[in-house]
Amino acid sequence: MLKREDLIAPVQYNLVNEMEKFSAAGQKTALLWEDESGKQESWSYEKLMEETNKIGAALADLGFKKGDKLIVMVPRVLEAYAVYLAILKSGMVVIPCSEMLRAKDLEYRIEHAEVKGAIVYSEFIGAFRDVSTADKLITLSIGENDAGWKNLLSIEADGSQFKTADTTRDDMAFLSYTSGTTGQPKGVVHTHGWAFAHLKTSAGAWLDISEKDIVWATAAPGWQKWVWSPFLAVLGSGATGFVYHGRFKAEKYLELLNRYKINVFCCTPTEYRLMAKVEGLKRFDLSALHSAVSAGEPLNREVIDVFQKHFGIKVRDGYGQTESTLLVGVLKDTPIKPGSMGKPTPGNQVEIINEDGEICKPGEVGDIAVHLSTPALFKEYFKDPERMKTQIRGDYFLTGDRARKDEEGYFWFESRNDDIIISSGYTIGPFEVEDALVKHPEVKECAVVASPDEIRGSIVKAYVVLQNHEKRSDELVKMLQNHVKTITAPYKYPREIEFVESLPKTASAKIRRVELRKREEQLKANKKA
C-alpha cells in the first residue's frame, strides 16, 4: 500500500518524463481518435513526442521562456496533448480554459495570471474578439488560419534538439481556475510534484490502468478532470487513450465502448445515468471493460445496478476536487458498500473533522478535510492568501463537502456545506432524496434543494426532469412523493415538486443547486410581499 513518502517526487522533476519514457518503445500507440463524422486518426508515443518537441521549439523561437503562463483553449483533438506537453516540458504553465468561457472570464484570467500567450483552436477564436486585453498576448491558433493569429502548427521549428527545462517538483505546472461560491474564480496552483502524486494515487489503485489497456476518459481539455485522467493518468501509465471528438449521445457512447473494446472507462454520473436508460442494452458487448469509474458527484445505486446486471461491471465512485486529487474512492480491491464514497486513498491523509478541527467519531457528520502535508494537495490560491486561510482549520484544508465515516472507515457523502436541508429540526442531505426520485421510471434527472417555509424553516423541494415532459400532472406529483416515502425516511420526501425541462448546470455538468436555492428564496420572498 502506498505511503505518503511514495507520493513525493524527486527534487529535480518534470512530469513530462512520465510520458516521454514510453516513446522509446517503438510504435507503441498513445492515442486513438474519432470524431462525429467517423474520421479516425492515431498517434504513437514517438509521434506524440515529436509533435511535442516541435511545438516546444516553436514556442521558444517566439520568445516564450520558463515560467511564462499560456491560456490553452482546445477541444478533444490530438494536438491538445502535444500542446500541453510542450508547455510543461518547457517549464511554462498551462492555464486550461473551456470554450464556454466568455470575454469577462478570459479578461480576468489574463490580468490575474499575467498571461503571456494563448493557444486557441480556430473555431474558438471568436471568444477572444471582445477581450480587451487580448492584444497584449502572443496569440497562436490550431486548425484553420485566422487573421491576426499565427498558426502554431505551421511554424517551421526544429524539435530534434528541444530539451526538457530544468524544473523542480515545486515549480508551477498548471494554474486552473475554479468557481467559488462568491467573488472571482480561484486560481489553483498545481506543481510538477502534485502531478507525480496524482498519477501515483489515481492511475493504478482507482482507474486500474495498465500499459496494455485502452482507456476512455470522457472529460474535455479545459477542465481539471481532463488533466487528471485523459492526460496524466492515461499517458503517465503508458496506456492507449481513446478520444471521441463529438457531442454526448448515450447510445453512441455505448456503441464506441463496444467497437473499440474499451478496457477502462471514466465518465460523469450524468453520462452513466443517461446510458443506463438506453433501451436494449443487451445489444452492446462491453466484455472488454474491466474497470469503470465515476467522479464529480455521487452515483445513484440504480445506475450501478444496471451496469452490474447488463455488463457485469461494477461502477466505482471517486471523490476529489480541483485543489487536490482523488481523495476518497472505491478502489479496485475495496469491497463495495452501495451508496458509500469508499475510503481515503493510500498516502493521502483525508479525515472528517468537526468545527474544532478534531477528527469526528464514526457516524458523526463533519467536514471532509485534507491534511496540509498531503503531497497531492495544491500549493496555493494564486495571489490570494486570504482565501486560502478561510479554508484552513488547524492542520487541515477544508474541501467544502460534508460526510460521515462508519466503523470500517468508509465515507458517506452528505452534501456540500450549503446544500444541507434543515426541515423541522431534521438534517436532510439532497442526494438521498434525488437517489430515490431517479429510481422512478418517469424521472430522467432531478435536483433537490431547501425551500423556505414559515412553519418548518425549510421544506424539501424537488426540481424534476421527466423522461416525457408531457406526462407532468398532479397525480404524478403524488406518485413521486409516495415513491420517495417508500425508499427513504418519510420525513425526507419532497413536499413540493416542480417539473422542468432542464436543470441549471456548470460547464462541467454539475448541477447548480445554488441557483435553484436562490430561485426558491426569491419566489417565497415575492409571495410574502
Curated annotation (Swiss-Prot):
Family annotation (NCBIfam families): AcylCoAsynMbcS
EC number annotated for this UniProt entry: 6.2.1.-
Keyword Heme: no
Enzyme's top EC category: ligase
GO MF term (any one): fatty-acyl-CoA synthase activity
Family: Belongs to the ATP-dependent AMP-binding enzyme family.
Residues that hold ATP according to the record: 178-186, 401, 416, 510
Protein name (database record): Uncharacterized acyl--CoA ligase YtcI
CDD domains: MACS_like
GO biological process, alphabetically ordered: acyl-CoA metabolic process; fatty acid biosynthetic process
Keyword tags: ATP-binding, Ligase, Nucleotide-binding
